[in-house]
């Protein structure tokens, strides 16, 4: 709701959240559906009030209407630091998803349910990055934030000598990615 005022296509994640509440978390009830609907509509209802107050509703909602006009994917809009960061996070996210699929039985049922939601959002954001790379400034941040619990779960539950070596290698790669991004200019 409120985040979609800053980045309107974030509203497209609402059906994914609704699906997750209904199927993965089994927590969708009438009151939670109304709360979701109210949370999505309240910021726009307040924005409508501002538009009516200033007698210019069309100007208030014009940026939000333009945000949903999708363009063809423009991969030239991606900078080299963004590509390097995306590649690093994608590598870690895929390894973490595979690790979770292999050792999910060790987690409690509720934890598994939450991680299935994280994985679903991960795949949706990956698809959004592939379809709209010109909007990667916001999508990459969402991608990193959503990937963090999966990657942390992987590093926390990884056991053995190879897991320790992999963690050290990932740490060195992270330092390399950060140094590259700092030397190249800016991260985003």
Short names for language-model regions:
Residues 32-69:
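Membrane-lumen/periplasm interface segments of specific transmembrane helices
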Residues 61-83, 96-100:
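Juxtamembrane membrane-water interface segments that cap and precede transmembrane helices
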Residues 177-188:
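Juxtamembrane boundary at the C-terminal end of a transmembrane helix
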Residues 13-41:
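Perimembrane helix-loop-helix junctions
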Residues 1-8:
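Membrane-interface alpha helices of multi-pass inner-membrane proteins
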Residues 129-141, 159-163:
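Membrane-interface catalytic loops of GT-C/OST-like multi-pass glycosylation enzymes that act
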Residues 96-121:
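Membrane-interface helix-loop-helix junctions at transmembrane boundaries of multi-pass membrane enzymes
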Residues 136-154:
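Hydrophobic/aromatic-rich transmembrane helices and adjacent perimembrane loops
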């Amino acid at each position: 709701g409120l985040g979609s005022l800053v980045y309107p296509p974030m509203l497209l994640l609402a059906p994914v959240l609704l699906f997750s509440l209904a199927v993965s978390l089994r927590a969708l009830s009438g009151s939670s559906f109304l709360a979701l609907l109210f949370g999505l509509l309240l910021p726009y209802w307040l924005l409508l009030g501002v538009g009516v107050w200033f007698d210019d509703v069309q100007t208030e909602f014009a940026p939000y209407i333009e945000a949903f006009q999708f363009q063809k994917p423009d991969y030239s809009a991606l900078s080299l630091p963004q590509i390097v960061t995306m590649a690093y996070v994608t590598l870690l996210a895929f390894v973490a998803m595979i690790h979770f699929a292999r050792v999910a039985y060790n987690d409690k049922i509720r934890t598994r349910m939450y991680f299935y939601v994280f994985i679903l959002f991960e795949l949706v954001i990956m698809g959004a990055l592939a379809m709209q790379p010109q909007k990667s400034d916001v999508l990459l941040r969402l991608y990193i934030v959503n990937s963090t619990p999966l990657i942390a779960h992987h590093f926390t539950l990884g056991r053995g000598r190879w897991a320790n070596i992999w963690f050290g290698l990932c740490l060195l790669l992270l330092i390399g990615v950060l140094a590259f991004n700092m030397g190249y200019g800016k991260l985003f």
